[in-house]
From Swiss-Prot:
Organism name: Mus musculus (Mouse)
Pfam families assigned to the protein according to its UniProt record, in alphabetical order: Complex1_LYR
CDD domains per record: Complex1_LYR_LYRM9
Signal peptide: none
Family label: Belongs to the complex I LYR family. LYRM9 subfamily.
Superkingdom per UniProt: Eukaryota
Cystine connections: none
InterPro entries, sorted: Complex1_LYR_dom, Complex1_LYR_LYRM9, Complex_I_LYR
Phylogenetic classification of the source organism: Eukaryota, Metazoa, Chordata, Craniata, Vertebrata
Protein name, per record: LYR motif-containing protein 9
Amino acid sequence: MAPLPGAELVQTPLQLYRYLLRCCRQLPTKGIQEHYKHAVRQSFQVHSDEDNSERIQQIIKRAIEDADWIMNKYRKQN
């Protein structure tokens, strides 16, 4: 299950970036939101020079799985 509707539509790094920032808005506190926004920005910068489309799709899939795990973690705590 994806953290937000529309995860299956994510095809490009920019779409992934926007999707993950929207996920961050769903987190419970401002501090947690800022922490994960920073992590998203850092990861985007680290992988910005990636040009292998297969690798990009792997990154997108893994990022959505990680976002799902994080969202479930904070849903269980509340």
